Amino acid sequence: MGIGLIMRLLDFSYADPCRNLALDEVLLEMVASGAAPDTLRFWESPAVFVVIGSSQRVQLEAHESNCLRDGVPILRRCSAGGAVLQGPGSLNFALALSYEHFPETASLHASYDFILGRVTAALCDLGMQVERQGISDLAIGGMKCSGNAQRRKRNACLHHGTLLYGVEPGLMGRYLTEPEDRPDYLGVRGHDEFVQAVAVAPARLREAIRRAFCPAALPETVSSAEEADVERLALDKYNSRDWNYRR
C-alpha cells in the first residue's frame, strides 16, 4: 500500500547544514500533525560537516581536532543511527510518512524492509548490484554505499538515508572515528576501505527513488510555516552546543 498516493516531492537544499537538518525534522512534525502530506525530500549539502546520531557522543564519533582545524561543523540529527560525513557527493533522501497511508512503516523493522526494499529495487533497475546489509545499510560487493536512520513518532516516521556518489577520498577517515558498533559485514576495515561511491549521476539516483515512492509527483516548495519552523529549530536546536554536545 502507499505507493500511488499523492505525495509531495521536495528537491531543496539549504546552504546551511543546520537548516538542512532542521527541515527533515520539520517535515516529520508536519506530517505527524496532518499539516502536510507524506513527503519525499532530496538534499545535498554544499558544505562538509559531520552529523552524529541522536544518542551518540561527539567525542567518540568525530576527530574533533581535525574538524576544528578545518572548520568542519559537528552536528547532531534528530534520528538514531551512526555518524555520517555530509557534503558534496552525498545525496540525501528523506521520507516523512504517516502510518495511516503507509501501514508498512508502522513498526521499525517492517519499515526498513519496506523502504529499503524499494530503494534497493530502484537502484538495481539502474544496473547496480545493490544488496541489503544489516538493518539499515546498502552495499555493493560488500562495500557500503548507503546508510539509513529513522526517527519514529506515534503516527508517523522520518526515514532518511544517504547515497554516496562522489565523496572525496580520505575525508571520512580524517573527520570520523572508526565505529565501535558496526555490522559484521564491515569487519575491521576503516571508513576509506568499506565505503564506496555508486557510479551513477545524482540526477538518475533522484529519478529512480522518486519513481519508487511518488511517480506522479512534481517538485513543490517549502511552505512559509515550514520555513518559520526551520529557522526556529536551526537557531534554537541545531546551532546549539547544548544539543550537539548533550551527551
Stretches with model-predicted labels:
Residues 44-46, 87-89, 132, 155-157, ...:
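A short, structural micro-pattern
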Residues 81, 112, 141:
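Glycine-rich phosphate- or other oxyanion-binding loops that anchor nucleotides, phosphorylated ligands
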Residues 2-106:
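N-terminal lobe of the biotin/lipoate ligase/transferase fold
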Residues 88-136:
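Contiguous, small/hydrophobic- and glycine-enriched helical/loop subdomains that border
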Residues 49, 90-92, 135, 144, ...:
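Broad gene-expression machinery/nucleic-acid interaction feature
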Residues 69, 140-141:
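Structural motif
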Residues 111-130, 146-247:
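Long, positively charged amphipathic alpha-helical accessory segments at protein N-termini or as interdomain linkers
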Residues 54-56, 95-99, 119, 134, ...:
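Short, structured patches in soluble enzyme cores that scaffold and shape functional sites
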